[in-house]
A protein has these predicted regions:
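Hydrophobic alpha-helical membrane segments, chiefly transmembrane helices and signal peptide h-regions
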Residues: 7-18, 89, 126, 140, ...
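Extracytoplasmic
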Residues: 64-66, 85-88, 116, 141
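Short active-site neighborhood of thiol/selenol oxidoreductases, capturing the structured segment around
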Residues: 79-102, 108, 121
Length: 201
């Protein structure tokens, strides 16, 4: 009796195992990694168009033009030559591994939200990984245009080896001021814009 029962159960178990082994489960899409996510930053195309409400800069003494240097945009698209950037503009050079850079980024984001077409806020991510920049952009809600300088060509051209670095550019594309004093806050940024670009925020 037991032997007969075993003969009946063995084929049934084999059939069940065969169904389990050969049945194909539908593939589930892999979760998107940070590198595959859309860029948090804005496109760079508007950087070569003058801000709609910009007025001629009258404060202070004009300096050198921005360097003849072409940088890629974080979002892709056409690279941007810094000589083609239309001011007034505030350029923030930063890296994800730099604590003062991370500290001041929210102030630059708020500044970009208060620009009202009078000036541009531009980021230059330098000596950094793309993933690091993407993570900070997402975590801090930074969405102004971002250029990539994976070396330090921009800083070398300015002869300023500092992080963070802020560059104020007038409507004629000339550098009015560079600041390497550390993390800037809202009040300090507002004071710099009024003093060097004649813009109140």
């Amino acid at each position: 009796m037991m032997r007969r029962l075993a003969y009946l159960l063995v084929p049934l178990l084999l059939a069940t195992a065969g169904c389990t082994a050969t049945a194909e489960e539908p593939e589930r899409p892999a979760p998107a990694t940070r590198a595959e996510r859309p860029s948090p930053f804005a496109d760079c195309a508007p950087l070569t168009v003058a801000p709609a409400a910009a007025s001629p800069t009258s404060a202070g003494k004009a300096g050198d033009q921005l360097p003849d240097l072409t940088l890629n945009c974080f979002t892709g698209g056409a690279p941007v030559n810094l000589r083609d950037v239309k001011g007034p503009a505030v350029i923030n050079v930063w890296a994800s591994w730099c604590p003062p850079c991370r500290k001041e980024l929210p102030a630059f984001q708020r500044l970009s939200e208060r620009a009202d077409g009078r000036f541009q806020v531009i980021g230059v991510n330098s000596r950094d990984s793309r993933g690091g920049a993407q993570s900070i952009g997402e975590d801090y809600g930074v969405d102004f245009p971002m250029l990539l300088d994976q070396g330090d060509a921009f800083q070398r051209a300015l002869e300023r080896n500092a992080f963070p670095l802020t560059v104020l550019v007038d409507a004629d594309g000339r550098i009015r001021h560079t600041d390497a004093t550390g993390a800037l806050d809202d009040a300090r940024l507002a004071a710099l814009l009024e003093r060097h670009l004649g813009v109140r925020v």
